[in-house]
């Protein structure tokens, strides 16, 4: 499954993995998974977190290592983001629910994920997605970016 990923995708997932793997030990625990999900405005129960880990925990050790994480991401990409998942993700970023993701909202979510970005980096991310040039990302632009991944 993971062998169908490009080098770019793998290095992107490595970066995502390290956001989850707070203590850098090469494994994601339920505690670490919960921390990241809560920083994204989700509120999973302990049982839900355990289910998520069990779903991809091939060796049954109760944590997710990088190869298991890659398999999960490859699977997720195959049943590409349903309309509902995209709307949900957009809502996470669109804090004031005005239908747009501003630079401030993007910075806020990235900071919650432990990604300290400079103003330039945030502006660059907005510019890359901002098709109509209004300085923020609307839902259509967001979908384009997510589907291009």
UniProtKB/Swiss-Prot annotation:
UniProt lineage: Eukaryota, Viridiplantae, Streptophyta, Embryophyta, Tracheophyta
Name listed for the protein in its UniProt record: Calmodulin-6
Protein family per UniProt: Belongs to the calmodulin family.
Keyword Endoplasmic reticulum: no
Assembly: Interacts with KCBP.
Assigned GO CC terms: cytosol; plastid
Binding positions for Ca(2+) 3 per the UniProt entry: 94, 96, 98, 105
Residues that bind Ca(2+) 4: 130, 132, 134, 136, 141
Transmembrane segments: none
Coiled coil: none
Gene label: CAM6
Gene3D superfamilies assigned to the protein according to its UniProt record, in alphabetical order: EF-hand (1.10.238.10)
Positions that bind Ca(2+) 1: 21, 23, 25, 27, 32
Keyword terms: Calcium, Metal-binding, Repeat
């Amino acid at each position: 499954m993971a062998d169908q990923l490009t080098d770019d995708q793998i290095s992107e997932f490595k970066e995502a993995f390290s956001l989850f793997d707070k203590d850098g030990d090469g494994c994601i625990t339920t505690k670490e998974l919960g921390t990241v999900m809560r920083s994204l405005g989700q509120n999973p129960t302990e049982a839900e977190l355990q289910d998520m880990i069990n779903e991809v925990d091939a060796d049954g050790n109760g944590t997710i290592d990088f190869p298991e994480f890659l398999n999960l991401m490859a699977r997720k990409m195959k049943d590409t983001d349903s309309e509902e998942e995209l709307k949900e993700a957009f809502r996470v970023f669109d804090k004031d629910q005005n239908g747009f993701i501003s630079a401030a909202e993007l910075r806020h979510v990235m900071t919650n994920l432990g990604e300290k970005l400079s103003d330039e980096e945030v502006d660059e991310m907005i510019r890359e997605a901002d098709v109509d040039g209004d300085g923020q990302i609307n839902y259509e632009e967001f979908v384009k970016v997510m589907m291009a991944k």
